[in-house]
Amino acid sequence: MHKDIATPIRTQEILKKYGFSFKKSLGQNFLIDPNILRNIVSHAKLTENSGAIEVGPGIGALTEHLARSAKKVVSFEIDQRLLPVLEDTLSPYNNVSIVHSDILKADVAKVIAEEMPGIEDIMVVANLPYYVTTPILMKLLNDRLPIRGFVVMMQKEVADRITAKPGTKEYGSLSIAIQYYVKADIAMTVPKTVFMPQPNVDSAVIRLIKHDEPPVKVINEDFLFVVTRASFVQRRKTIYNNLQAGLPNGKTQKDFILEALAAANIEPTRRGETLTIQEFGKLADALYPVFAK
């Protein structure tokens, strides 16, 4: 067994060898606790027939644990300076491919087809860059990739919002946007002390498992998300007031908004944070004829 990359001493050795300095703009925080990494991989439930997609491998700390568990690992790295480092640290593993690309611009489905032919169980497993966590998740969900789900590390505050239930202060349009596609829960919390350099916030690993069917069927998915975003324009305001302010030409359609709320059996005095995803689905369908133009 090779020495783990994710120890303080080994990480320092690698950084010194390559004269690597962290780029704050890329949100680079490397894990230095192999036990955390083993737990992350364990939550992904990978087998020798699984594939793993990683975003931001850094110096390969999580990548090597994935390589030990999965049939194939594909890691997307935006920072060109890390390519020779990864070539070195991951040289013992012949089942890893590094793709030098911004994940937000990558054709991930094409990469999966080319790099993982015949692999039916695929998970996204990553320590996500905190500054682009939400855009990465939404891109990968919207791309409808042939994956089972995600086990990903992120800022604890964002994890709380993603997994929030109706009626809580964390619940909002992000909760609905993610939970429309997946069942979401927090697998573990991670202290800031296990990173180099230490971030200012604690982290959490969340598990997102794709639904077989969405929790609500709607006329138009994009419009559902337009309605949910509008419903949280100002959290202290009622759903009725927020829809007027947040929907295009909402001020001129007050009566229709009231009719749509009644059709969806939603009191206009309620706040967006109290509505379930099923209620948002009914509301979006009721609003669709006038606002989806």
From Swiss-Prot:
Catalysis performed (reactions): adenosine(1518)/adenosine(1519) in 16S rRNA + 4 S-adenosyl-L-methionine = N(6)-dimethyladenosine(1518)/N(6)-dimethyladenosine(1519) in 16S rRNA + 4 S-adenosyl-L-homocysteine + 4 H(+)
Classification via InterPro entries: KsgA/Erm (IPR001737), rRNA_Ade_diMease-like_C (IPR023165), rRNA_Ade_Mease_Trfase_CS (IPR020596), rRNA_Ade_methylase_Trfase_N (IPR020598), rRNA_adenine_dimethylase (IPR011530), SAM-dependent_MTases_sf (IPR029063)
Binding residue positions for S-adenosyl-L-methionine: 29, 31, 56, 77, 102, 127
Entry's EC annotation: 2.1.1.182
Pfam families: RrnaAD
Entry GO MF terms: 16S rRNA (adenine(1518)-N(6)/adenine(1519)-N(6))-dimethyltransferase activity; RNA binding
Main localization (coarse): cytoplasm
Keywords assigned: Cytoplasm, Methyltransferase, RNA-binding, rRNA processing, S-adenosyl-L-methionine, Transferase
Gene3D superfamilies: Ribosomal RNA adenine dimethylase-like, domain 2 (1.10.8.100), Vaccinia Virus protein VP39 (3.40.50.150)
Cellular component, GO annotation: cytosol
Subcellular location: Cytoplasm
Uppermost EC category: transferase
PROSITE patterns assigned to the protein according to its UniProt record, in alphabetical order: RRNA_A_DIMETH (PS01131), SAM_RNA_A_N6_MT (PS51689)
Highest taxon listed in the record's lineage: Bacteria
Family recorded in the similarity comment: Belongs to the class I-like SAM-binding methyltransferase superfamily. rRNA adenine N(6)-methyltransferase family. RsmA subfamily.
PANTHER family: DIMETHYLADENOSINE TRANSFERASE, DIMETHYLADENOSINE TRANSFERASE-RELATED
Reported function: Specifically dimethylates two adjacent adenosines (A1518 and A1519) in the loop of a conserved hairpin near the 3'-end of 16S rRNA in the 30S particle. May play a critical role in biogenesis of 30S subunits.
Official protein name in the record: Ribosomal RNA small subunit methyltransferase A
Organism name: Lysinibacillus sphaericus (strain C3-41)
Encoding gene per record: rsmA
